[in-house]
Amino acid sequence: MVQNAEYGSGVEITRLEGKGNGRGDLELTYASEQDILDNTIASTVTYTAGHGPVDIRVVDPIRVPDAEFELRLAGDDADLEDAIDAYWTLTNETMLSDDDPDNDYKAVHESSTSIALLNEELLLDWGLSVTLHQYAYPEDGKFTEPVHASITFDDSSKPWFVGIPDQEGFSELNWIRAGNQEGADDVPSEVIFNDLKTGNPLDEDEVYEGILGGTWAPYCLVSYTGDVELPTGEVVSLPNIAPTVDGLEGDLSPFSGISGLNNVDVVLTSNKDLWTRCPVLEMQSVHELAQDEDGDDGTNTRPEKLTLRHHPSVDKNGRYAGQSGYEGPGNQPMGMGWFPGYAIDVGTGERLNMAFGEDSWLGADNGDDMLWNPSPNIYGGVGGGFGGGGGGSAIYAGGQHWIYVFKNSQYEEGTENRMPAYDEGAYLYENLEVSGSTTNVRRVFRACTWVGSSLLNDGFELLSIEDGLIPNDARIRLRVAKAYEKYSPTNVDAEDNYDGATNFWNPLYTFSTKDIAAVPMQDTVLTSVLDEINVVPNPYYAFSQYETSKLDNRIKITNLPEVCTIRIYNLQGTLVRQFSKADPLTSVDWDLKNERNVPIAGGVYIIHVEVPGIGDKTLKWFGIMRPTDLDNF
């Protein structure tokens, strides 16, 4: 048999129903990501080998069959939270569908333990193992653990995008409120900077302060701008540099805390066909400084922080209605723009709504043009924001181009009057427009899961808006542990309505071992195997890593089939050494001696490998011999 997988190799897994990943680091295949971008919601999604919601691995490559499998979790209307009663069932569909009735009972395997227990189940007849362990949310269900976070660039030598690292203490740049910093309740400024604000989700161990170097965080942990009365009696809004405002901070519902986080990819791209229609939010907290270009009758209607920018909506080239060449929709006249990229929930297979911010007072840092184009400046000129920093300079935070990612909350809240999957920003616009009520605004931000800070790396420049802004596509991956649960990509009421369900909307997966199955040693296979035969090291310069002593000379002829004959000749055609191999080892050691056990001379040798009934392979090898070491005599 010829193996097509290694021990520990994973398999591509397709999710049909349900959601959850345990502690798995999910990664979609290219085809699944394109399906989501084309259709907003994918009915099925496929994950790359080793990055699926279930850990399925090869443990015996020779035994892996060419088969199609189905994996069901709790194949009835069971409560997956009560994991002690939930089991999984793996079915070899290929074996089940053959004509041998004796295979029917062999084709189905039920887990020997419930998913409440961490167990790697060995399926030795199929050369596989399955690990499926239900995740239990800590802190009475209010917390989940981060699994992985990364940022990658198509051109890794040009990391143009960075963020604003979180700082500690009473500083405007302490924008992630994790830890145990507790301010005095009677000092307003300390209340604003309090990590332990009443009602907020707790992250006392600060595990979420380190996401990508403290540049991304859960929305429920970010800092907020609030009114503070100074000793002079003046009331000011502090801190100015913050992603949200008092009243919209923290966990706004049972679904918006840390345990409600989702697994997302945020992609920045110059491909305008993939850009996201979204609101542009005003980030200037001083009402009188915010830009007002809404073309009204002259009354002062300057926007409050975290509301729609008072600026005409722009198209993908930054033009607005009335300007030559404008190509934008006409039904969202104010405050809408385009984020140069997209966000995907890799756990549910949905494209997500987004928003980004701008501080319209910071025009020099691109804060007033309705484009996501952060500057490289954390600090500005001489002045100084609350908390100081930067040698007394004011904090500009790149123009405050915060990135907001919103999950589809319709399913978990059980109503269609909640944030949907990507709808070109329609839900966000309807609920955030100037006349939007406080209830509507809270409804929006209770669906916000992740916030990213934005800063252009020193020494880099963005492209022009006409060329797509992004100089080098970047991908941010944010992964957390999620419990397995019911889910339907098309049915909001999946808890009670099973129409169209195969497994009661509980997790249901399929995978194939066709590409990794062991195959018989057919002639065509072995012929290709001949191409892999090699000799190492080549050339040999007096030493090799395979030698065990000063008197040892050794090279290896590698990637050999089980049965073959190896003949080694000098350039005069004289046979120097012959090996007859008939064992499962894949290499033969040559001690650089002839048949009479005499060390060979340096030079070029011809190595001929003959595989009976298949073919042969000829290699040239060059070696330089070292003098015999007589120190040991």
Q: Across the structure, where does each feature detected by a protein language model lie?
A:
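Polybasic, low-complexity Lys/Arg-rich tracts in intrinsically disordered regions
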Residues: 2-570, 576-596, 608-610, 616, ...
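Hydrophobic beta-strand segments within extracellular beta-sandwich modules
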Residues: 602-603, 607
